[in-house]
Amino acid sequence: MLTAIRKNGLILAVFACVSTGLVALTYALTAEQIQQQEQKQLLQVLNQVIPHKYHDNPLAQACTLVNDDKLGTAKTMHAYLAQRDGQPTAIAIETIAPDGYNGEIKLIVGIANNGTVLGVRVLAHQETPGLGDKIDLRISNWVLGFNGQQVTADNQDDWKVRKDGGQFDQFTGATITPRAVVLAVKKAVEYVNQHQQQLHNQPNPCEGQ
């Protein structure tokens, strides 16, 4: 009987080892696929907010880490540094609108060296379907209204929704969400305008993060 118990114990031990190995292998393969998919999605977004004509460098690798309250959060954000023929041309920077209707709205803003907004995309949000979710390009083209805009000393009041006297449309039944996004984009542009040279001169420590 003792021999049978030992035999069963050995079988269970082998089974446990094999199962653990299979789980580890599956995780490793899945993690690699997830990482590749995330990298692909990142490149797609970066190329939307910084068009190809502005860069010939690998944007996803030309990345630096930024921490500033101007970006709406105490968390570390990513900034992607575009170059063309070895010369700085634009920056895509992550930012947070902390005061969305249902919480934080994460954005990425592409800004040319002359301060012109090249593109804005929403990376994450929890806004109400049919109302605040119109900030998402998959739902409406509202976010394209930032393209070509600049922030200057003379147009500060324009960077508001129309209900507040500005130039950006609000949504029917949802003013809080677009108001939050407009302010967040404005602050991101101001931050990049103020720190452009510093950002381009920073090392690129965030590859793979």
Curated annotation (Swiss-Prot):
Spans through the membrane: 9-29
Pfam family, one: FMN_bind
FMN phosphoryl threonine: modified positions: 175
An annotated GO BP: electron transport chain
Entry superkingdom: Bacteria
InterPro entries according to UniProt: FMN-bd, Ion_transpt_RnfG/RsxG
Subcellular location: Cell inner membrane
Any one GO cellular component localisation term in the record: oxidoreductase complex
Residue runs in coiled coils: none
GO MF entry, a single one: FMN binding
Broad class of the protein's primary localization: membrane
Bilayer topology term: Single-pass membrane protein
Top EC class of this enzyme: translocase
Nucleotide-binding is among the record's keywords: no
Entry keyword set: Cell inner membrane, Cell membrane, Electron transport, Flavoprotein, FMN, Membrane, Phosphoprotein, Translocase, Transmembrane, Transmembrane helix, Transport
Cofactor(s) recorded in Swiss-Prot or TrEMBL: FMN
The EC number(s) this enzyme carries: 7.-.-.-
Record function comment: Part of a membrane-bound complex that couples electron transfer with translocation of ions across the membrane.
Subunit structure and binding partners: The complex is composed of six subunits: RnfA, RnfB, RnfC, RnfD, RnfE and RnfG.
NCBIfam families reported in the protein's UniProt record: PRK01908.1, rnfG
Family: Belongs to the RnfG family.
Protein name, UniProt field: Ion-translocating oxidoreductase complex subunit G
Organism of provenance: Vibrio cholerae serotype O1 (strain ATCC 39315 / El Tor Inaba N16961)
